[in-house]
């Protein structure tokens, strides 16, 4: 019965086993890529299978008469050798989410495609590289093997609507942030070595800096290895030059030092994901301090420098990882596995799963000296034997698979050559063919935790592994919360453009009532195992269905039917999501066009107001100029009058005296003439008086002569009266 149970638990459909192995081999988060992880996993799997097969062939001791007859344990049927997986296809990321980044102090528009920023090349040429000719730029691109991709129609339309490109632009090139950093560094800061100087002086300065206790030897592995001397006291600002290159003896800021290199420029390497702002992850302590007393002190000093001016709090001190569980726990696990042959058989069947997770754990834990803590280490095909032999534990398996899932979700080919836009081709295929060819895609996010729920034969194992999980999670929480937060942020950027966002709902179809796969977990075992949730529960349902419900042809056909149904539902959900996304993009474009029109109107009104203000300002300036000229003229006249007054102040009294004397003389002459006229008039009056008196006298005489003499008679009296006057 026990052997039969073991044989039943070890049976899996070859096609499904191949699919699962292909997924796990393709989803490794390693700089070496799936090829290195696949080779390491296969060799470790073969080695452990050979060990267990040798242990199973050891002859049993001869039983005595008192002992019961031994039970013959037949070795379980070994699964077929792993088949090399084919290429892993992913839909191209055509993200149209525009954002901005800073390159050499200039703000550049870009699109986040597959987690890598693609910058607008014309904007870089017109701002950062405006002092260089196209011939120089093309020659440097050919030397560095930099190729630019062509933006899609949606991206080109967005750049036109936002005013970054003219509406007549037929196309636009996009360059990755990594290649843009390389290109700008080669053009702006290329030139390698300083002008020649006295060798004795340069050697003495370099030797003095190296022998100083205040300097730390560091290096980086970006675009070729480069060594330098870090002087922490010189790091007084984010852009302070505090690292001296040991090759050219020039000082560089940290974010420029990580791009600086002299020897192997790695021009034929496909670079991806570089950002000079993350220099804290690229600058490492020199290997010369390995095993020395000052290694810990200088490491803390380097961490202090990295924590300075870290306003975003992205850098956190690394906590050392424990590569193996405690010695007091391992014997219990070994005893438990030796007591339950069925559980050891299941562990052997999932060896490739643990081995691949262990390889991912190595890439994150960096416990091997050849795999140092480097965020930008070039891939090397040489894999040491110690790296292939792994003994991972459960907490690291869960954490690293989460990192693998998050990082693989946003993976995309980093660089493509500039080529004309390709047209999408629609190929109609039967549902079964779709399931076979695209099987890894719905499982991309379904097998996230890689935590296997134990069955009835291994009910005691969770009791031993749970304390290890708690202890390891406490130790790794500080070091891995940064990785998880970064990967969640990166995956959220491309969640709309990746079909994996529907995997959770599609994977839930495996637990539908149509499966009829009862769980094989005992109540006592379920009490000790934490209740899985989300993708972990879906993975357990899938594994239970594979282990317990696929022993007949009808069950297999039913399972395939459910998988086809799940695939159809996933395609429907994906189509609906893409349609909704397309509608939202159209609305967004409409809003952007309307906003652009309003912005254009506001710009026109602003331009008119500016013209009116300029006109009023010109008139005001003209009036002010005239007023100033008038003021200057009046001031000049006043100064002239004042100067004349000051100059003539001495002779003014004489001139006035002469003037007044002349006037007095004139008046005196006039007075004399008036006196003469007066005398003449007086004389004339006297003559007239005399003449009048003479005339009166003559008249009187005549009157007397003419007066008649008086007569005594009356008639004579009348005549006298008549003659009287």
UniProtKB/Swiss-Prot annotation:
Describe the function of this protein.
May play a role in terminal differentiation of skeletal muscle cells but not in the determination of cells to the myogenic lineage. Functions as a repressor of TGF-beta signaling.
Q: Name the keywords, alphabetized.
A: Coiled coil, Nucleus, Phosphoprotein, Proto-oncogene, Repeat, Ubl conjugation
Q: Name one GO cellular component term.
A: PML body
Q: How does this protein assemble?
A: Interacts with SMAD2, SMAD3 and SMAD4. Interacts with HIPK2. Part of a complex with HIPK2 and SMAD1/2/3. Interacts with PRDM16 and SMAD3; the interaction with PRDM16 promotes the recruitment SMAD3-HDAC1 complex on the promoter of TGF-beta target genes.
- Map out region (Disordered) in residue numbers: 1-77, 319-352, 457-521, 697-725
- Membrane-crossing ranges are none
Q: Which InterPro entries match?
A: c-SKI_SMAD4-bd_dom (IPR014890), DHD_Ski (IPR047315), DNA-bd_dom_put_sf (IPR009061), SAND-like_dom_sf (IPR010919), SKI/SNO/DAC (IPR003380), Ski_DNA-bd_sf (IPR037000), Tscrpt_reg_SKI_SnoN (IPR023216)
- In which residue ranges is the amino acid composition biased (Acidic residues)? 471-482
Q: Where is the composition biased (Polar residues)?
A: 14-30
Question: Coiled-coil intervals in this record?
Answer: 534-708
What superkingdom heads the lineage? Eukaryota
Q: Which CDD domains match?
A: DHD_Ski
As for PTM, the annotation reads: Ubiquitinated by ARK2C, promoting proteasomal degradation, leading to enhance the BMP-Smad signaling.
Q: Which SMART domains match?
A: c-SKI_SMAD_bind (SM01046)
List compositional bias (Basic and acidic residues) regions by residue number: 40-51, 697-716
Q: What is this protein called?
A: Ski oncogene
Tell me where in this chain the PTM Phosphoserine is found. Answer: 380, 429, 477
């Amino acid at each position: 019965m026990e052997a039969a149970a073991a044989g039943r638990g070890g049976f899996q459909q070859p096609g499904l086993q191949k699919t699962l192995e292909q997924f796990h081999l393709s989803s490794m988060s390693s700089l070496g890529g799936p090829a290195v992880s696949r080779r390491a996993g296969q060799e470790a799997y073969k080695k452990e299978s050979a060990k267990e097969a040798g242990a199973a062939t050891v002859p049993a001791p001869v039983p005595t008469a008192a002992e019961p007859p031994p039970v013959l344990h037949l070795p379980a049927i070994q699964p077929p050798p792993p088949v090399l997986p084919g290429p892993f296809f992913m839909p191209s990321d055509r993200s149209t989410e525009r954002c901005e980044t800073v390159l050499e102090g200039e703000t550049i528009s870009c699109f986040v495609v597959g987690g890598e920023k693609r910058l607008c090349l014309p904007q870089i040429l017109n701002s950062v590289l405006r002092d260089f000719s196209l011939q120089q730029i093309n020659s440097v691109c050919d030397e560095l093997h930099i190729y630019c991709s062509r933006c899609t129609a949606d991206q080109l339309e967005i750049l036109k609507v936002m005013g970054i490109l003219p509406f007549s632009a037929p196309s636009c090139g996009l360059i990755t942030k990594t290649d843009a950093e390389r290109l700008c560094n080669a053009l702006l800061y290329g030139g390698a070595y300083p002008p020649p100087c006295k060798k004795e002086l340069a050697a003495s300065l370099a030797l003095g800096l190296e022998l100083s206790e205040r300097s730390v030897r560091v290096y980086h592995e970006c675009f070729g290895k480069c060594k330098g001397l870090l002087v922490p006291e010189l790091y007084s600002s984010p852009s302070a030059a505090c690292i001296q290159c040991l090759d050219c003896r020039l000082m560089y800021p940290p974010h420029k030092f990580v791009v600086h290199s002299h020897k192997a420029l790695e021009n034929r390497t496909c670079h991806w994901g570089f950002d000079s702002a993350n220099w804290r992850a690229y600058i490492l302590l020199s290997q010369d301090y390995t095993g020395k007393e000052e290694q810990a002190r200088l490491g803390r000093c380097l961490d202090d420098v990295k924590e300075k001016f870290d306003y975003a709090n992205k850098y956190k001190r690394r906590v050392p990882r424990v590569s193996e569980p405690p010695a007091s726990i391992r014997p219990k696990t070994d005893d438990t596995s030796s007591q339950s042959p069925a559980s050891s058989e299941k562990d052997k069947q999932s060896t490739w799963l643990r081995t691949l997770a262990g390889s991912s754990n190595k890439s994150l834990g960096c416990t091997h000296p050849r795999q140092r803590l480097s965020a930008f280490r070039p891939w090397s095909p040489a894999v040491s034997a110690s790296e292939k032999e792994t003994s991972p534990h459960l907490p690291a398996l869960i954490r690293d698979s989460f990192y693998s899932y998050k990082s693989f979700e946003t993976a995309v080919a980093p660089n493509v050559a500039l080529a004309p836009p390709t047209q999408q081709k629609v190929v109609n295929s039967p549902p079964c063919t779709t399931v076979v060819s695209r099987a890894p895609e719905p499982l991309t996010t379904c097998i996230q935790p890689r935590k296997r729920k134990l069955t009835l034969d291994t009910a005691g194992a969770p009791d031993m592994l749970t304390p290890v999980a708690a202890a390891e999670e406490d130790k790794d929480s500080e070091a891995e919360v940064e990785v998880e937060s970064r990967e969640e942020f990166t995956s959220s950027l491309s969640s709309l453009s990746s079909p994996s966002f529907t995997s959770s709902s599609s994977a839930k179809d495996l637990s539908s009532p149509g499966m009829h796969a009862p769980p094989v977990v005992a109540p006592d075992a379920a009490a000790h195992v934490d209740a899985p949730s989300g993708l972990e529960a879906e993975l357990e349902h899938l594994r239970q269905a594979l282990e317990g419900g696929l022993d007949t042809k009808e069950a297999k056909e039913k399972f395939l039917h459910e998988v086809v149904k799940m695939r159809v539902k996933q395609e429907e959900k994906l189509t609906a999501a893409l349609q909704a996304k397309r509608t939202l993009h159209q609305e967004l474009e409409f809003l952007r066009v309307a906003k652009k029109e309003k912005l254009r109107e506001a710009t026109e009104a602003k331009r008119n107001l500016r013209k009116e203000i300029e006109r009023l300002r010109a008139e005001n300036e003209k009036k002010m100029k005239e007023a100033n000229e008038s003021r200057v003229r009046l001031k000049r006249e006043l100064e002239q009058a004042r100067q004349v007054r000051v100059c003539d102040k001495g002779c003014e009294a004489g001139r006035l005296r002469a003037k007044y004397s002349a006037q007095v003389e004139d008046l005196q002459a006039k007075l004399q003439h008036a006196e003469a006229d007066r005398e003449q008039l007086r004389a004339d009056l006297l003559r007239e008086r005399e003449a009048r008196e003479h005339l009166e006298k003559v008249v009187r005489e005549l009157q007397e002569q003419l007066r008649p003499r008086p007569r005594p008679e009356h008639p004579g009296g009348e005549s006298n009266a008549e003659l009287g006057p």
